[in-house]
Amino acid sequence: MTASGDPAATLTLKGGPTVGRLGLGAMRIAGPGVWGPPSDEQEAIALLRRAVDKGVNFIDTADSYGPGVSETLIARALYPYPAGLVIASKGGFTRPGPGSWAVDCRPEHLRRVCGESLKRLRLERIELYQLHTVDYRVPIEESIGALVDLQREGKIGRIGVSNVSAA
């Protein structure tokens, strides 16, 4: 990935598309506590459309936002997607209930939730798919290995990680 210090600049994903340095994080378009639908779905849809109309070409979401609500709203608002729009999603958190987050980065879980994200987003391939967190019960090589398999199958373009540090 390359970038400059200019906030209007772009980032180029390795070997892939160029996106605006400022994107839209879609976590908060779900309901309170990132659970369930928003109180005003039409407002959330209008926000997504306005962002794209204003030049945003990168939207970041996750299967756990809602759960599933954020991805569903993105598709309802923007499908068929405009040329150049990059949608990133994540897998590795589950939502047992409102206000509750649990980690699950087992390969079989990641494969399942990526498939569900593809369906909700109405995509054949997610351009950037990220491991949402590290699951200390699962060797990271197994979690990343599952994403590599999904990439080889053409279901994801690029692999990323979220909620990690250099330590």
In which residue ranges do the predicted regions lie?
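N-terminal binding-site loop/beta-alpha segment at the start of enzyme catalytic domains
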Residues: 1-86
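Conserved beta-strand positions
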Residues: 24, 61, 89, 128-131, ...
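A short alpha-helix capping/helix-coil boundary motif
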Residues: 25-28, 94, 125-127
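A short acidic, helix-capping loop that chelates divalent metal ions and anchors anionic groups
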Residues: 30-34, 94-101
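Short beta->alpha linker loops
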Residues: 65, 69, 91, 135, ...
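Hydrophobic positions in alpha-helices of CheY-like receiver
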Residues: 78, 91, 147-150
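A short, structured active-site edge motif that brings together acidic residues
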Residues: 84-97
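Glycine/proline-rich, positively charged
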Residues: 97-167
